[in-house]
């Protein structure tokens, strides 16, 4: 596991200002790995992907009362039905707890995540590996970073694997787009995504893109 001290420091600094740290970022950017870098003896880790965790958090107050650790990590919190309620109860009723919640950066744009946490949280947006972090990734160079991309797994790989990003894109659609926004046309999403990549840095004309891709403007 590659340690990323830059981000660990940002999390600790954010806790000094608010009880909740919202760690967001694109899929596979290293959010879960970063939570594992916290001292295990101080952390109560909850994987919200698991049905048992969802059931356990139906009564957030009871969950917090039974917690014996000073840090609670909710990994993939957007899998919960009402994540903002779980976080708000923790911040208001158990102010001594430090809470770290991870999830997709698209979650804030959904109705599922109402902004009822004003003054209670700080956001840390985990980016792909930055230039200043290359030293933490061993033999990674700027050239390799540009060729392999900035996600930790392909950056650590010895050879370029295009299938990783195809799998990543499929996962991004099924869990972040389809799951959160109920959008059910993967071929249209992929076409738009590739179009945006080709247009990177250029002007995006909605009407022109819709016509060229055969996608309606509202979509």
Label every model-predicted segment.
Residues 31:
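Conserved lysine of the Walker
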Residues 1-15:
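Pre-Walker A adenine-sensing motif
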Residues 125-219:
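Interdomain hinge/linker elements that couple catalytic modules in large macromolecular machines
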Residues 34, 38:
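Hydrophobic positions on the alpha1 helix immediately C-terminal to the Walker A/P-loop
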Residues 107-122, 138-139:
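Short regulatory helix/loop adjacent to the ATP-binding pocket of P-loop NTPases
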